[in-house]
């Protein structure tokens, strides 16, 4: 396990530089005790993708690939898996619900093995490179990419800001409340 402190860097820029090498970013904006870390996941390896319930048992498959490593470190990630679980995965956990779920082109569940990360601790104002296998090649690539970031120009985005008509939005809220009361849904996410 390698943990190397580095200078603070804009994690989003890594994604801009190479989205294949840096595919996932969890960024905290409420820098308090419970939301103090931003994590840029690096060097994706094997993946497990569930597209249909009948393909395989996703959670059992994931568990068979996970090795528990015990590290007494004060960081939220020291190597492991980045996992996306859709609401539809409930169809494998509670099979009676599977027939009621909508089909989609988006995977039901998706896991990617991630050996390295760049982690910013906003509370301590420190940034670290973490590599679970002490892989100098990956660590040096991250450091090289950091140097390359200095040459990325700042660009503004042209366009207009628009938002949905307020009446249409509030009608959607009312409809959602009706669905919840009727028991048709248990959660609704609305955004504007």
Predicted regions and their residues:
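Signature of the chorismate-utilizing enzyme
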Residues: 1-192
């Amino acid at each position: 396990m390698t943990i190397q402190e580095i200078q603070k860097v804009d994690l989003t820029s890594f994604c801009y530089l190479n989205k294949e090498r840096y595919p996932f970013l969890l960024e905290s904006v409420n820098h308090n005790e419970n939301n103090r870390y931003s994590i840029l996941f690096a060097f994706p390896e094997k993946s497990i993708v569930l597209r249909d319930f009948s393909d395989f048992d996703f959670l059992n498959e994931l568990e068979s690939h996970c090795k528990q490593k015990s590290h007494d470190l004060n960081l939220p990630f020291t190597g492991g898996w980045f996992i996306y679980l859709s609401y539809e995965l409930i169809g494998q956990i509670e099979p009676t619900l599977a027939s009621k779920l909508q089909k989609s082109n988006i995977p039901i569940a998706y896991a990617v093995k991630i050996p390295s990360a760049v982690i910013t601790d906003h509370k301590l104002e420190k940034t670290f490179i973490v590599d679970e296998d002490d892989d100098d090649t990956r660590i040096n690539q991250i450091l090289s990419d950091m140097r390359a970031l200095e040459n990325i120009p700042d660009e503004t985005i042209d366009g207009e800001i628009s938002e949905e008509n307020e009446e249409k939005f509030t009608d959607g809220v009312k409809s959602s409340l009706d669905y919840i009361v009727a028991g048709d849904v248990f959660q609704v996410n609305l955004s504007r």
